[in-house]
């Protein structure tokens, strides 16, 4: 199965909570699960186009960390995404990726572009590949939406004060989404067959945007976890998305 490197960004685009100044709202603890879900759905309404820059660090057990800078442009109207990763010191392009029309196009200045069906695309870590996630799991988050798994009929819910947990399970995997005050705070994923585990935790709120200030992703398979940390550096929620900005070659 194909894997992509340095792509932990795919697990994080939670939305902002919405409050109307003229309306006195009940404390979140007093809302029903249905009311909380409706507030979450409304809070995650995606922008037509946005652009963000971020720094990413990867840590493997017993090895020194690796760093890269990244940018992402998301066209929600046409379901297109463009990533670029560069060296943090010299600014040299390391890799680039476009997602559109059901395919992932990934390449680098040294390698030809690979075309991979989205259903077969795996968000991976570095050398030991302990971070392994199906891209579909986080696709809606990357487009600025909550995964439909959160609202599915077979999803189970539980609450702890201001926190809401949505647990979805099928034959292959189990996913747990944690929300607090209408914002996603963590996603936990377990693949049953190969015991691949991953957990993404989002902290803080980047000003005037739906992004967290930091996302930490840990992945492990029967051993110490591999870690990736993403720190957001700039966000433009009114960016322009044009055809030329989503090349496939």
Predicted regions and their residues:
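Short hydrophobic/aromatic-rich beta-strand segments that constitute the beta-sheet cores
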Residues: 80-85, 104-108, 166, 186-189, ...
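N-terminal leader/targeting segments and the immediate start of mature chains
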Residues: 17-75, 244-249
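Acidic/charged, solvent-exposed loop-and-adjacent secondary-structure segments enriched in E/D, K/R, S/T
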Residues: 107-146
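N-terminal mature ectodomain segment of secretory-pathway/periplasmic proteins
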Residues: 46-110
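Extended beta-strand-rich segments in extracellular/periplasmic secretory proteins, especially
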Residues: 143-210
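Non-transmembrane domains of secretory- and envelope-associated proteins
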Residues: 18-27, 110, 160-163, 191-249
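Hydrophobic/aromatic beta-strand elements that line small-molecule binding cavities or substrate pockets
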Residues: 69-74, 175-177, 200-204, 230-232
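Sec-dependent bacterial lipoprotein signal peptides
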Residues: 1-16
């Amino acid at each position: 199965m194909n894997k992509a490197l340095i792509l932990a960004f795919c697990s994080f685009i939670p939305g902002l909570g919405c409050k109307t100044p003229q309306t006195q709202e009940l404390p979140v603890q007093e809302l029903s699960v249905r009311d909380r879900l409706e507030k979450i759905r409304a809070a995650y309404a995606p922008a037509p186009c946005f652009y963000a820059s971020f720094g990413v660090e990867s840590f493997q057990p017993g090895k020194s960390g690796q760093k890269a800078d990244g940018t992402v442009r998301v066209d929600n109207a046409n379901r297109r995404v463009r990533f670029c990763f560069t060296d943090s010191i010299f600014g040299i392009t390391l890799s680039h990726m476009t997602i559109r029309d059901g395919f992932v196009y990934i390449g680098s200045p040294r390698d030809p572009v690979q075309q991979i069906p989205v259903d077969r695309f795996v968000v991976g870590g570095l050398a030991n590949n302990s971070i392994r996630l199906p891209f579909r799991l986080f696709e809606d988050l990357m487009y600025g939406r909550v995964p439909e798994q959160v609202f599915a009929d077979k999803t189970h819910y539980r609450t702890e004060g201001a926190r809401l947990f949505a647990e979805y399970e099928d034959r292959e995997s189990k996913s747990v989404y944690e929300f607090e005050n209408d914002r996603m705070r963590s996603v936990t994923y377990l693949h049953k067959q190969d015991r691949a585990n991953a957990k993404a935790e989002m902290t803080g709120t980047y000003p005037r945007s739906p992004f967290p200030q930091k996302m930490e992703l840990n992945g492990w398979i029967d051993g110490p976890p591999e870690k990736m940390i993403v720190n957001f550096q700039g966000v433009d929620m009114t960016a322009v998305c044009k055809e030329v900005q989503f090349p496939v070659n």
